[in-house]
């Protein structure tokens, strides 16, 4: 039987679009937009209105992860939640507060956060206006 080294880190991974959905966001990302155009492209037509409900249940979810021995969680921050105005880069304080509470809850449960700033979820406004990452704007 294989045994893991004592310093092996058991972790989990998700992304903002997968776990938070579009609850209480000012903007759509490309996944939110895609779902409005073609819900049948998503498994069982489950889209950003449903997701795993982490946005509302993160405190309990993180407690369960702690109880399961999870020591690290990789997730992403959705620009469509964090940024209020994409031209001025004004931060959406409610979005920033949400991510702050999530990170605090991770740390309180002994879970090291690994944060990804882009999980293929560009705000659709930037995609439409500038053509996405190909733009030099």
Question: Where do the model's predicted regions map?
Answer:
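N-terminal carbohydrate-binding accessory modules
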Residues: 1-67
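Substrate-binding cleft and catalytic face of glycoside hydrolase catalytic domains
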Residues: 23, 62-137
């Amino acid at each position: 039987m294989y045994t893991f080294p004592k310093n092996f880190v058991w972790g989990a991974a998700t992304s903002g679009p997968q776990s938070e959905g579009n609850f209480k966001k000012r903007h759509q990302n490309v996944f939110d937009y895609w779902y409005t155009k073609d819900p049948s492209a998503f498994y069982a037509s489950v889209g950003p209105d449903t997701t795993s409900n982490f946005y509302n249940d993160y405190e309990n979810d993180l407690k369960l992860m702690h109880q399961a021995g999870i020591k690290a969680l990789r997730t992403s921050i959705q620009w469509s939640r964090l940024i209020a105005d994409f031209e001025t880069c004004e931060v959406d304080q409610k979005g920033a507060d949400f991510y702050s509470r999530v990170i605090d809850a991770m740390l309180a449960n002994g879970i090291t956060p690994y944060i990804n700033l882009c999980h293929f979820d560009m705000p659709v406004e930037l995609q439409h206006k500038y053509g996405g990452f190909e733009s030099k704007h």
